[in-house]
Design a protein with these regions (language model features):
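Amphipathic alpha-helical interface surfaces
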Residues: 5, 24-31, 45
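A short, surface-exposed loop/turn module that caps and links secondary-structure elements
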Residues: 33-59
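Enriched for short, Lys/Arg-rich terminal
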Residues: 2-4, 11-25, 50, 58-90
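Generic recognition of well-ordered alpha-helical segments
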Residues: 11, 30-33
């Protein structure tokens, strides 16, 4: 699947590039690759979100941060919405 990034996710990627520890940056790279290959399974504890975030998925980068993304199967696209903080922190 193709990966696209929202403007907020692009800002988060830049933040990680400038401020992130190597372990987290490497994990983000691995998780994004996995998401492109199989968005609903794999490492980072993929989780379908519910309530006001229904239709979105998350994967753990570390204890505090998550990748939040949407799977648009009709377009064969994964839209990454966020790469920092926990979804309840937004």
């Amino acid at each position: 699947m193709e990966i696209a990034y929202s403007p907020d996710a692009q800002k988060d990627l830049e933040w990680w590039r400038l401020n992130g520890d190597e372990s987290s940056k490497n994990k983000i790279t691995r998780l994004i690759q996995e998401i492109s290959e199989h968005p609903k399974t794999g490492t980072g504890k993929p989780e379908a979100l519910s309530h006001n975030l229904a239709g979105l998925w998350s994967r753990r980068i570390n204890k505090k941060d998550r990748i939040i993304y949407q799977i648009l199967e009709d377009k064969i696209l994964v839209l990454v919405l966020s790469l920092r903080n926990h979804y309840s922190d937004k």
